[in-house]
């Protein structure tokens, strides 16, 4: 009986499972489930034919294409530079390291509208950086390149923060053993380091891609939102539909975005679960 009592005591949770679960479920319902359910309920008013017609309009398809391609490119670039930045922050000590690490939180703390205005001015034809590209005929602001730069800015922390803990736990002995066995730096990275950080890198890629797909504030100022140049993104199209009180179109597009986001989250969780199982098996 004493053993059972001790076992029950170890399993108890303070302030109690019922209370904590109730609070969690209430907050989850208010902040996430109810708003998502309202989108689903409103979308049920549309017939399948009406829904298909709304989401396959040419401006909507162009916006989806722009958002997906630019988000994918930005997330891929973030994976490359995110790994490099995480490696530098973990493996080296240098002056200003803490400042650089803290600056990674800036995209989280800075209002996206402020970031968008700053980037659009900086990369305009007369801006601090854009004027040098303008001299060689390269336009950044109000183009797809500008959109990608904005998405890189808001997405880079997701990759770095996902990879950093893995690199921090990775023992240097694996690299030393590879070096002793005759492996060069390139082989060591691809055969020893990359397999360890790959799940975290995929997670960071998925999070950066998802953030880019739904980004609004930092993109609308630098994209130009031109129908002719196909620089409108999905979030801008949804806002435009709402401004014109076209709720059916806005709901249909939002629902499609919601489905894409859920698929991405499912894939991210699937990768994490597989990695967890592999780690436990080892």
Give names to the regions the model predicted.
Residues 22-27, 106, 153-155, 159-171, ...:
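Transmembrane alpha-helices
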Residues 3-12, 72-104, 117, 121, ...:
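Transmembrane-helix boundary motif in ABC transporter permease subunits
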Residues 10-12, 95-99, 144-146, 170-203:
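Amphipathic cytosolic juxtamembrane alpha-helices at the membrane-cytosol interface
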Residues 12-16, 58, 216-267:
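Interhelical loop and adjacent transmembrane-helix boundary motif
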Residues 2-4, 12-15, 19-23, 31-34, ...:
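C-terminal transmembrane helix and the adjacent membrane-cytosol boundary/short C-terminal tail
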Residues 136-179, 205, 266, 270:
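Membrane-cytosol interface at the C-terminal ends of specific transmembrane alpha-helices
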Residues 9-14, 18, 39-76, 91-92, ...:
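Periplasmic/extracellular loop-to-transmembrane helix junction in inner-membrane transport proteins
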Residues 4-10, 48-56, 61, 97, ...:
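Membrane-interfacial helix termini and adjacent extracytoplasmic/periplasmic loops
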């Amino acid at each position: 009986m004493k053993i059972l009592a001790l076992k029950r005591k170890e399993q108890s949770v303070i302030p109690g499972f019922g209370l904590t679960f109730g609070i969690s479920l209430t907050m989850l319902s208010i902040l996430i489930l109810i708003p998502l359910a309202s989108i689903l309920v409103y979308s049920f008013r549309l017939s399948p034919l009406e829904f298909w017609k709304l989401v396959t309009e040419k401006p909507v398809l162009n916006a989806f294409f722009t958002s997906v391609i630019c988000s994918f490119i930005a997330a891929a670039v973030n994976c490359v530079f995110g790994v490099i930045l995480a490696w530098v922050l973990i493996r080296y000590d240098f002056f200003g390291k803490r400042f650089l690490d803290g600056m990674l939180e800036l995209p989280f703390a800075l209002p996206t509208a402020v970031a968008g205005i700053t980037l659009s001015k900086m990369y305009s034809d007369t801006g601090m950086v854009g004027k040098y590209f303008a001299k060689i005929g390269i336009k950044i602001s109000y183009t797809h390149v500008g959109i990608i730069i904005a998405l890189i800015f808001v997405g880079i922390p997701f990759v770095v923060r996902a990879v950093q803990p893995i690199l921090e736990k990775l023992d240097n002995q694996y690299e030393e053993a590879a070096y002793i066995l005759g492996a060069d730096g390139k082989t060591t990275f691809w055969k020893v380091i990359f397999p360890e950080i790959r799940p975290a890198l995929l997670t960071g890629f998925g999070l950066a891609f998802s953030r880019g797909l739904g980004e609004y504030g930092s993109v609308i100022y630098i994209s130009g939102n031109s129908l002719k140049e196909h620089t409108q993104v999905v979030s801008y199209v949804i806002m435009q539909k709402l401004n014109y009180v076209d709720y059916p179109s806005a709901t249909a597009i939002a629902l499609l975005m919601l489905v894409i986001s859920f698929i991405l989250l499912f894939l991210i969780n699937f990768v994490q679960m597989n990695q967890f199982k592999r780690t436990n098996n080892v």
